[in-house]
From Swiss-Prot:
GO terms for cellular component: extracellular region; immunoglobulin complex. This is Ig heavy chain V-A2 region BS-1. The modification Pyrrolidone carboxylic acid is found at Q1. Residues 1-107 form the Ig-like domain. Keywords: Adaptive immunity, Immunity, Immunoglobulin, Pyrrolidone carboxylic acid. GO terms for biological process: adaptive immune response. Pfam families: V-set. This chain was obtained from antibody to type III pneumococci and was isolated from the serum of a single rabbit.
Amino acid sequence: QSVKESEGGLFKPTDTLTLTCTVSGFSLSSYTVAWVRQAPGZGLEWIGILKSSGSTYYASWAKSRSTITRTQNTVNLMBSLTAZDTATYFCARITHGYLGLMDVWGPGTLVTVS
């Protein structure tokens, strides 16, 4: 069971970021998947989640600018970037609760906004 993020890269403010989280070994109809990020020198910050039902929930700051969608085996994040969005972005599987135990993590992908 694994998840893996697509490649990040170098972006400019106002660019649209599109990241894909590819899952294997489990079904998105049975698990919630979260997108989280970690800016340099900072802690983890959640962006949003996609529940097994297909419902999405977002952090307050992300509601107006982020969209999470899914296909059969991917969870996709689209985000309108600002200069403060440089971070390593991760997807993770949640096993319990709204933002409960995240037991399967991707390696992360670095997004630089400059």
